[in-house]
């Protein structure tokens, strides 16, 4: 029997052979002794083999023997012990229960022995924490141990075993199954913390079981019929994977109640593969089944499968199949795949037009290709020849589509000689609409002064035909950039391509024979007269003969073959001299001087003349403009700009000269007044006109024409070197932001090269 003390003074007496007896409200030591006596009586009954019930009379007799006579005096040890047990039920000053300190007991409790109880004894008892399900230790105090009570493992009292031996064992203060010590303040309350169990691979194991059911056709509740194949499946699994089946089985539609569902237009093997995927999450992608899988996955709305199939097809793109993949993606509504296939077609158009897929395209697809601005082609003649190849492949059927498709060709951008040959071509000679288009292109060439009024989508060059924009050097946060970046109009990206051999500031760059000539400048210590040449095709540098004069802040441009170096500063004074590089003789020669010394000058070529715009002459910035005629070797003053501009960017478009950005401040003023305004010069009227301003002020801005737009690259806004770039459309008079530079820079030289 075990006697266990609860905080509310309740002793629970457990017996192996008989039902449990609960004594409620016992508050003195006699209750413990009574329980011991009762236990001894139960043992004697068990040893004698008696199985009679323990009746109420026996309980009352034992109670009378122990509780009916209070023989002890108030000063006796028992009374002291009773008082100690009574204090367990009293309330302390802090409102809590007082608990007995085992060290204060006067009566050695080691003489009171308890036996273990088996698990059977607890079947009808309240639930409470136990050290073991097989053994419940005794709770016992010893006179030697004042550190608290211990859980003791007591052997059962067997036949022939004396009580003294049991008591001796109980005083050993050892545990056989546990060495844990229970402190005197242990409340023995049940644990109330929550526990959560997470099964590993639960979903995987569940779907494996479902796959097993599918394999053995067990518990299937729907049959999918594709062609002559019947595929059993489980609605729950299909609905959990496919939005198509989820909508079918969870809504009030006819298929929700049918046991067999016909899948019209679905390839049976692809359907079976996707049903297996629903159970396993695995799918084999092969070239011979990828299109069927993708079309079926699109129908069943299996987004992950669609994405995987699209990525697979992206890896298979080739000039021989990109058009087919592009059309297939468009039919299936796979926008990402269509975009990638289209871009691949545009990038490799020269190879695509030599493959069979191109000549087999319908006229509608040919029209979509011809309308694109993104074709990677060297010139417009390439596209016209591709169109003629397509027409001749089935001349009788396709001749009627020729005039409609010819309208997508940018005929005004073809050479006049090419247009003359077209006019006499048998394919166009008898087609009135084709003749109209050819005449329109001829007028564009014959009447250059009317070109602003003849602008149309056919006069807009394709992106790949306009060349590549290069930004060379400039001032950056490290006090001098040597890197060169190029801008691709088709991808709208800047990419580093090369580095100069050394640092140059306030230098000039011009393009001659598709090569970049870097002229003059300063290296931070001295002004330079050196020239070096960069070949973008071979990505190599070569040293050229130097100028006669050291110059920084100069302007450089190519006019009718030779290259001109205009003005600048030689380290001592502002220059009005001009040198000309003869590429045939490979030498520099002086030409007529300008009327005004100019440094940080803007230089551009327009209508066979060289223009020097603004700059500074030492004391202040200039708003004067003069032009050089190479045939007369003279400089002539032109109309002045509305603003003084040093560090101005200039370029030309459609017979007009544009001056962009710059600063206006005297040399002694450290705070420059930066400009965002733009104005253009018409040489026919000798007048400047203001146009839309840039989004921000830009000093030392690089400006260049690319296609039909003017690009303002980098510059300085008074606080930072800019990496932003914006493009001006003269036809709409609007500026738009484009991709930024990789490196912020001011004073970069920006030129266009046709690669």
UniProtKB/Swiss-Prot annotation:
CDD domains reported for this sequence: BACK_KLHL5, BTB_POZ_KLHL5
UniProt region (Disordered), positions on chain: 152-184
Biased composition (Acidic residues): 158-168
Biased composition (Low complexity): 169-184
Domain of life: Eukaryota
Family annotation (InterPro entries): BACK, Beta-prop_ATRN-MKLN-like, BTB/POZ_dom, Kelch-typ_b-propeller, Kelch_1, KLHL5_BTB/POZ, SKP1/BTB/POZ_sf
Expression (tissue specificity): Expressed in adrenal gland, ovary and thyroid gland and less abundantly in lymph node, prostate, spinal cord, testis and trachea.
GO cellular component terms given for this protein: Cul3-RING ubiquitin ligase complex; cytoplasm; cytosol; microtubule cytoskeleton; plasma membrane
GO biological process: proteasome-mediated ubiquitin-dependent protein catabolic process
Keywords: Actin-binding, Cytoplasm, Cytoskeleton, Kelch repeat, Repeat
Protein name in UniProt: Kelch-like protein 5
